[in-house]
Amino acid sequence: DRYHLILVNIESLSDVSHVLGMSAEKDYLCRLSNRIKERFSRPNILVGRGHESEICFIVSGDEMAGISTLVNEIQRCMDKTVILSGVEIPSENYFGIACAESLSEEDSHWQSARSAMNMAKEERLKIVWFDEKLKQAGIVRSLLITDLKDAIEHDQLYLLYQPKLSLISNRVTSVEALVRWRHPEKGIIPPDLFIPLAEKTAFIHDITRWVINYCCKQAAAWKLMGLDLTIALNLSSRDLSDDRLVDYIQACLAEHELSASSLQLEITESAALQDEKQSIETILAIKKLGIEVAIDDYGTGYSSLSHLRTFPFDILKIDRSFITDLVDSKMNQAVVKSTIAMCHDMGFSIVAEGIEDAKALNLLKQWGCDVGQGYFISRPISSEEIQVFSLANTMGKG
């Protein structure tokens, strides 16, 4: 017999622990496991637990159609809402499936199933089967991870800067640093490909340190030219758990004789939620240095309003998904206008990213938005272009 290994990631598990606590998470897993075991107690199916948020199945049988039907049954079973402490917990699950001729190399087959499951999760697909195409993609990723080490060691990384315009003074007061990778053979590697890879390894710490140091070096160079620009840079969830991060930032500021106002740090809501307690501790330590911290991509996370009270952010960046259709969407206008008013009352400065036309910019100015960012103001540009853009001191000359 052939075997099919099915690995399921229970994405909603993190929401359970955030809302109801760790004990509720265990209760949720227990109920879900019992439901599955009762429903799929068959001679050809073994059900067990994988990693913390995973359930695994070993199914004997050749027929692909039969396996597809079974997977759909499992999906329907797991998608049913679970009620805990009177709260309905919606289910979100991702399936990875691998085929095995035998279980003699079970570990490698589970690795294949996990690769498929991770792809399903990343691409927001419900079910992914491991095949030759996915195998090749995995090989490419492995090579990129190897090359990433060389990129850091051999100066293949560089920064572009996207200007951020004060909508009050109409002056460029800050920029966002965006890391890029110029591979010697493959050309420019998109950040949405190599950053997620780096975040899965310790390389993200090396990249973040490189960016912090380079930003401090650049800020010092601009100061000598009379440009007093704050540089915003992004931190990942792994960075927030780095107990040497804050000391490194402080050392870089001191080395380049910069004040804390030279840097600003941006953290996505989802990154902060990976380890809420650790994130809050790190953010408070960063703020103690005098550096402002922004919540990035606001409006796309889970239970956003409660997080504004929990996390000690200074700045709120409204996600571009609300801004790009601002002119044509009355709903987006209502959300953005009320968010600006509410968050100003809470003491936040507001940044709108994704501004692509004059009408959206004017609406944001009318509503009192503090800072704007987007291609209408400027695309990401080099440090030399920033000098010209900023010294021109009026939007449209960049």
Model-found features: residue ranges?
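Conserved long alpha-helical elements within nucleotide-processing catalytic cores of c-di-GMP signaling
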Residues: 1-5, 11-37, 48-52, 56, ...
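A short glycine-enriched loop-to-beta-strand structural element that forms part of the catalytic core
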Residues: 4, 49-58, 77, 83-118, ...
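Conserved helix-loop-beta segment at the catalytic/binding core of cyclic-nucleotide signaling proteins
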Residues: 33-64, 291-295, 348, 358
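Catalytic strand-loop-helix junctions within cyclic-nucleotide turnover domains
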Residues: 58-67, 85-88, 92-109, 133-136, ...
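Catalytic core of bacterial c-di-GMP phosphodiesterases, primarily the EAL and HD-GYP domains
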Residues: 103, 167-176, 201-279, 354
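C-di-GMP signaling machinery
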Residues: 106, 110, 115-158, 168, ...
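Active-site core of bacterial EAL-family cyclic-dinucleotide phosphodiesterase domains
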Residues: 140-197, 234, 295, 352, ...
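EAL-family c-di-GMP phosphodiesterase catalytic domain
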Residues: 184-185, 236-243, 262-277, 289-398
